[in-house]
């Protein structure tokens, strides 16, 4: 191998590393900013799902005045979402490369599989523990005398009462929701982006407004197809879920028999609001951060120079 070939190989390797780092940084920034803006809608969604209890024991607790209480459980959710978003984009890019042909092309089914893989990966590494902490904090705030002081206190209670496995309570419905959600969201976003790109003059870029709209539509599609899984996930992560439900299948049957089919879409409007906004924010910020990092990337400059 010539010195030039070695240089080109090293440049390509550095560029791949740079791409992964860019995805990681951009995903974290996009996820963190999205939660800071949209968390009150997540709080409302979770409260609505926890309030749906049938019969004489219906627990419709008065809503707190809008303010800091609407950010209860935000810190673990913010951390988890930032990590999750990074994992989602990095793993999605990785799975797409694995499923692509020799020319780098990937089918729509391949995009769907990459989305499922990204969802399962993010659920395992970030989502389930952070959402478990968030859910019990929000549920605790519904009590007349809340006992959980902060996120660290919530973690100590989970560890004390349930051990390490307590952080993964609701893992299967969470994984199902994340896998389906990522497949639908990323798949629909990629498809819609390809459609818009095909109608864009050659060499032209999709503008910020169009990117926001595409991301928002992808978020809206995701909500109504995955809301039943989200409702089951929330119920399975509440404080007394193990004694009340046992497992996700019993939980789903109980919701259907006691509350009716529509109960699976509890909080759908609030989640729609959040995911429509977050879909636009995440994809728009992600694309812009990646563009900015590409401008200052040494690997990018070397490749152009080569």
From Swiss-Prot:
InterPro entries linked to this entry: Mitochondrial_sb/sol_carrier, Mt_carrier_dom_sf, TXTP-like
Keyword vocabulary terms for this entry: Membrane, Mitochondrion, Mitochondrion inner membrane, Repeat, Transmembrane, Transmembrane helix, Transport
Pathway noted in the entry: Mycotoxin biosynthesis
GO annotations of cellular component type: mitochondrial inner membrane
PROSITE patterns per UniProt: SOLCAR (PS50920)
Transmembrane feature ranges: 24-44, 67-87, 113-133, 170-189, 209-229, 267-286
Record's subcellular location: Mitochondrion inner membrane
MF annotations from Gene Ontology: citrate secondary active transmembrane transporter activity
Keyword Zinc among UniProt keywords: no
Membrane topology: Multi-pass membrane protein
Pfam families, A to Z: Mito_carr
GO biological process, one term: mitochondrial citrate transmembrane transport
Effect of a null allele: Produces fumonisins that lack one of the tricarballylic ester functions.
Solcar repeat extents: 18-98, 109-195, 206-292
Primary localization class, coarse: mitochondrion
Keyword Transmembrane helix part of the UniProt annotation: yes
Family label: Belongs to the mitochondrial carrier (TC 2.A.29) family.
PANTHER family tied to this protein: SUCCINATE/FUMARATE MITOCHONDRIAL TRANSPORTER-RELATED (PTHR45788), TRICARBOXYLATE TRANSPORT PROTEIN, MITOCHONDRIAL (PTHR45788:SF4)
Primary role: Tricarboxylate transporter; part of the gene cluster that mediates the biosynthesis of fumonisins B1 (FB1), B2 (FB2), B3 (FB3), and B4 (FB4), which are carcinogenic mycotoxins. Within the pathway, FUM11 is involved the addition of the tricarballylic moieties to the carbon backbone. FUM11 makes a tricarboxylic acid precursor available for fumonisin biosynthesis via its export from the mitochondria. The biosynthesis starts with the FUM1-catalyzed carbon chain assembly from one molecule of acetyl-CoA, eight molecules of malonyl-CoA, and two molecules of methionine (in S-adenosyl form).
Protein name, per record: Tricarboxylate transporter FUM11
Name of the coding gene: FUM11
């Amino acid at each position: 191998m010539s010195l030039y070939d070695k240089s080109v190989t090293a440049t390509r390797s550095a560029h791949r590393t740079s791409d992964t780092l860019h995805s990681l940084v951009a995903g974290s920034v996009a996820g963190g900013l999205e939660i800071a803006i949209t968390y009150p809608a997540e709080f409302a969604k979770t409260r609505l799902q926890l309030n749906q209890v049938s019969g004489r024991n219906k627990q419709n607790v008065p809503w707190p005045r809008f303010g800091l209480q609407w950010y209860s459980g935000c810190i673990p959710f913010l951390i988890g979402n930032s990590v999750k978003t990074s994992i989602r984009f990095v793993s999605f890019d990785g799975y797409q490369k694995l499923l692509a042909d020799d020319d780098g092309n990937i089918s729509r089914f391949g995009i769907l599989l990459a989305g499922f893989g990204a969802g399962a990966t993010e659920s395992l590494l970030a989502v389930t523990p952070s959402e478990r902490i968030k859910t019990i904090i929000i549920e605790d705030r519904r009590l007349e005398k809340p006992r959980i002081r902060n996120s660290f206190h919530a973690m100590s209670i989970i560890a004390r009462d349930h051990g390490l496995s307590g952080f993964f309570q609701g893992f299967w419905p969470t994984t199902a929701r994340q896998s389906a959600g990522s497949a639908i969201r990323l798949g629909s976003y990629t498809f819609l982006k390809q459609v818009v790109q095909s109608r864009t003059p050659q060499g032209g870029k999709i503008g910020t407004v169009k990117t926001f709209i595409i991301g928002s539509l992808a978020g809206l599609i995701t909500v109504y197809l995955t809301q039943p899984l989200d409702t089951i996930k929330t119920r399975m992560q509440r404080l007394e879920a193990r004694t009340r439900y046992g497992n996700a299948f019993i939980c789903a049957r109980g919701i259907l028999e006691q509350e009716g089919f529509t109960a699976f879409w509890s909080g759908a409007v609030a989640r729609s609001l959040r995911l429509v906004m977050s879909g636009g924010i995440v994809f728009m910020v992600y694309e812009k951060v990646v563009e900015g990092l590409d401008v200052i990337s040494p690997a990018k400059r070397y490749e152009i120079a080569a």
